[in-house]
Structures are given as structure tokens and as C-alpha cells.
Amino acid sequence: MSIDPRVDIGHVHLKVSDIDRALAFYRDILGFDVMQQMGDQAAFISAGGYHHHLGLNTWESRGGSPPPAGTTGLYHVAIRYPDRRTLGEALRRLVDAEWPIDGATDHGVSEAVYLRDPDG
């Protein structure tokens, strides 16, 4: 059995410890637009006007710690910028914010910069 090729991922929710800190990263550094915010409990962010690509919430995680190494869970999320210029602009914001960068590579089909969000 194979999944229908028209299926896509509508959005992903991330449990974060602090909405303001998460928005400072996803909005101010990576460049996402805030589509809706529910105080300090949740924010829904998007690129291009979609209702939300990422949900950020503190419903079960306010003030929490990142999971310890060696545990299961989400490994990474790839955010594709449309071209090198736009990726470069995001990289410039990361550098200006002195955000730690874990690495970078050219996959042949895409170029990647690896980093961790405020919650690891």
C-alpha cells in the first residue's frame, strides 16, 4: 500500500517552554509571519499566508527543559527557503543574533544550515 501523492503535511506543533523566546527565533530570525497568537500559550506561524505551518505552544511544556540526549522524538525540521539569496538573508539574521550554528552542508539538491531552536 502506498500513500496518495497528493497528501502533504499541513502543519507541525512544537511544544516550547516560552512563546516570546520561540517567536524571537522563528519570527525575528527565521522570518516567519505570526498568523495568530493566544497570549503566552500558543502562536501559529506561517510563510506565504498559509494559516500555519508551525504551531508553537506551551500547553504542556511551559518552563520545560529540552529532552535529554538519547531519547526519541522529533529529530529535525527542514525549512526550505526559495533561493540562495533568501537563505543568505536568514543566515545573516542568525549571525547578527549570534545564534549558534551546528553546521552547514551542500546536499546537491539543496544547501543546509543546521541549528537548534531555543528549546533544543
Where is each model-derived feature located?
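Helix N-cap motif at beta-to-alpha junctions
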Residues: D18-I19, P82-T86, D119
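Histidine-centered active-site/metal-ligand motif
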Residues: H11-H13, H51-L54, H76, H107
